[in-house]
From Swiss-Prot:
Biased amino acid composition, Polar residues: 341-369
Biological process per Gene Ontology, one example term: dauer larval development
Entry keyword DNA repair: no
Effect of Y171F: Likely abolishes phosphorylation. Almost complete rescue of fluid accumulation in clr-1 e1745ts mutant. No rescue of fluid accumulation in clr-1 e1745ts mutant
Protein name according to UniProt: Multisubstrate adapter protein soc-1
Organism of origin: Caenorhabditis elegans
Database matches in PANTHER family: GRB2-ASSOCIATED-BINDING PROTEIN, PROTEIN DAUGHTER OF SEVENLESS
Top-level taxon in the UniProt lineage: Eukaryota
Swiss-Prot/TrEMBL keywords: Phosphoprotein
Effect on the protein upon substituting Y31F: Likely abolishes phosphorylation. Almost complete rescue of fluid accumulation in clr-1 e1745ts mutant. No rescue of fluid accumulation in clr-1 e1745ts mutant
Outcome recorded upon mutating Y220F: Likely abolishes phosphorylation. Almost complete rescue of fluid accumulation in clr-1 e1745ts mutant. No rescue of fluid accumulation in clr-1 e1745ts mutant
Name of encoding gene: soc-1
């Protein structure tokens, strides 16, 4: 492809920065021609040839995509992503560098060229700027100021920002003290009405404005603790922490639990009337005088503690139960046990041998009856056992009461299971 001589504007040998390996570049000397490729539309281009014969076109750069032209660049400039491959000798020859930036859609690519001298570099830069209608950004100053990189521009913007801050501070110093105090006072009051202090030591923070501090601190009433002098905002009362000497625990199969987690036995003082005889056992609680206990001694946990028969009782036993209205089909084995007991009493008076034989049978029967009525076992209240090392609570159980004492007890299933586990734990420790 040959270019007519009338279309050629400028031509000559220039060195171009070219990438030939990964992360490696080198400067290659090619022949460049600046010409008009379309006079009707006034379009220009720079063609790159391998030699001055202009018979092998390497690449064409269209000037309608030019966005900027830079001159007087150096190899050490960070904007040039190309190094001198020949060391210091090659770097000394790369003095007259200029760059042309092209924009393709959203991508900007730079073409860096090296001229032989400053006059040739200036000629190329002026012709490209005239054809692309570009203007110089810096009309004053030397040529080295025009070659400053983007880093210097960032430093200038930061300097201007610092100057604006200094001017604001100087302006604030010139404000009269009365106006400045009024403005600070208004700012403090707005903060105190719209927001709460995030720091618990808000009232103790130093503040030069005593009046605003008094206004703000009057909104929050503070109290001081006995341990330290740190003030806190007032709020709901906090319950006192539990003291260490009242740690009441029980050990169950290697597990440690709290005593208050076990439901306490309730004592009912009123008669519970049965309305439906089919759904219930037909029993009522007797209105009897409660069993007399000695005066209670309030423990550290807040519940009464009684002493009876040399044992420390924490809770009182439930009232007796009336079984007069219980259906006959629910009595069953208990009546038979009563009949055998009556016979055993008579046998003691009449014949000693018979009573001994019958008493053994009765004891076996009572044991089988106890095993069948495990869901109705009655437990004594929890006793306090004091050891030399640690004061603990252990629940001990007794045998099932006879029907003459308490004929029938309705015990909650969950409560019974809890007491049974405590009994097994006590037996295993023994």
């Amino acid at each position: 492809m040959s270019i007519p001589d009338e279309n050629i504007i400028l031509e000559g040998s220039l060195k171009r920065c070219k990438k030939y390996k990964l992360f490696k570049t080198k400067w290659v000397e090619h022949y460049f021609v600046l010409h008009c490729r379309d006079r009707e539309r006034n379009l220009f281009a720079i063609d790159e040839f391998k030699t001055s014969r202009k018979n092998d076109l390497k690449k064409r750069f269209k000037l309608e995509f030019v966005i900027r032209v830079e001159s007087n660049l150096s190899v050490s400039d960070p904007s040039i992503l190309c190094t001198a491959g020949g060391g210091h000798q090659e770097e000394s020859m790369l003095n007259c560098i200029f760059g042309v930036g092209f924009r393709f859609e959203n991508i900007v690519k730079d073409l860096y060229l090296v001229a032989k001298n400053d006059e040739e570099m200036t000629l190329w830069v002026n012709e490209i700027c005239k054809l692309c209608k570009l203007h110089r950004q810096h009309d004053e100053g030397d040529s080295s100021h025009a070659a400053e990189s983007s880093i210097s521009g960032m430093s200038m913007s930061s300097q201007s920002l610092d100057m604006s801050i200094i001017e604001q501070q100087q302006y604030a110093e010139n404000i009269p003290e009365s106006k400045q105090y009024h403005r600070m006072h208004h700012f403090k009051s707005v903060i105190s009405h719209n927001s709460l202090p995030s720091n618990p030591n808000y009232n103790n923070l130093p503040d030069p404005l005593e009046s605003s501090r008094s206004e703000t601190s009057s909104m929050y009433s503070s109290r001081r603790t006995e341990d330290d002098s740190v003030s806190y905002t007032s709020g709901p009362p906090v319950p006192p922490p539990r003291t260490r000497h009242t740690l009441n625990r029980f050990v169950k199969n290697g597990q440690v639990g709290r005593l208050h987690m076990i439901p306490a036995s309730t004592s009912m003082g009123q008669v519970v009337k049965v309305e439906d005889a089919e759904d219930s056992s037909g029993e009522t609680l007797k209105l009897d005088t409660p069993e007399q206990y000695p005066e209670s001694v309030t423990s550290s946990e807040g519940f009464p503690v009684y002493e009876r028969n040399g044992k420390t009782l924490i809770r009182r036993a439930p009232p007796p139960v009336d079984r007069s209205n219980k259906p006959k089909n629910l009595r069953g084995e208990e009546e038979a046990g009563t009949r055998y007991r009556n016979l055993s009493r008579n046998g003691v008076n009449e014949n000693g041998n018979y009573s001994a034989t019958f008493s053994s049978r009765t004891s076996n029967y009572q044991q089988s009856e106890t095993s069948k009525r495990r869901n109705l076992d009655y437990f004594e209240p929890t006793q306090m056992i004091e050891n030399s090392s640690l004061s603990t609570l252990a629940a001990t159980s007794t045998r099932s009461p006879t029907p003459s004492d308490i004929e029938y007890i309705s015990v909650d299933v969950d409560r019974t299971l809890a007491f049974k586990q405590m009994r097994r734990a006590a037996q295993s420790t023994d």
